[in-house]
């Protein structure tokens, strides 16, 4: 049985980029299953949909956040 859902255009276009040759149902099943496993799996899905430039920028941002966290001084 199929159901109709309404989503925002921007969400639709992100799902289209992520799904590749899969059906929307397959993609959503995968995302729901990954949610149960953790955020790292979700990031791995995202990396598969990013261009090389987007991956580089994402890694750069992660490094900046890590450096920022490492700069914190412990409070006694």
Curated annotation (Swiss-Prot):
- One Pfam family it belongs to: VAPB_antitox
Which InterPro entries has this protein been placed in? Put_antitoxin
Q: Per UniProt, which keywords does this protein have?
A: Toxin-antitoxin system
Q: Which family does it belong to?
A: Belongs to the UPF0330 family.
Function (record text): Possibly the antitoxin component of a type II toxin-antitoxin (TA) system. Its cognate toxin is VapC2 (Potential).
UniProt xrefs under NCBIfam families? PRK13696.1-2
State what protein this is by name: Putative antitoxin VapB2
Q: What is the species listed in this Swiss-Prot or TrEMBL entry?
A: Pyrococcus abyssi (strain GE5 / Orsay)
């Amino acid at each position: 049985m199929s159901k109709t859902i309404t989503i925002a255009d921007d969400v639709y276009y992100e799902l289209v980029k992520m799904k590749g040759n899969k059906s929307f149902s397959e993609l959503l099943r995968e995302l729901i299953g990954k949610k149960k496993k953790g955020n790292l799996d979700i990031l791995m899905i995202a990396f598969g949909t990013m261009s090389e430039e987007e991956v580089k920028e994402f890694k750069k941002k992660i490094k900046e956040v890590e450096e920022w966290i490492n700069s914190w001084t412990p409070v006694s």
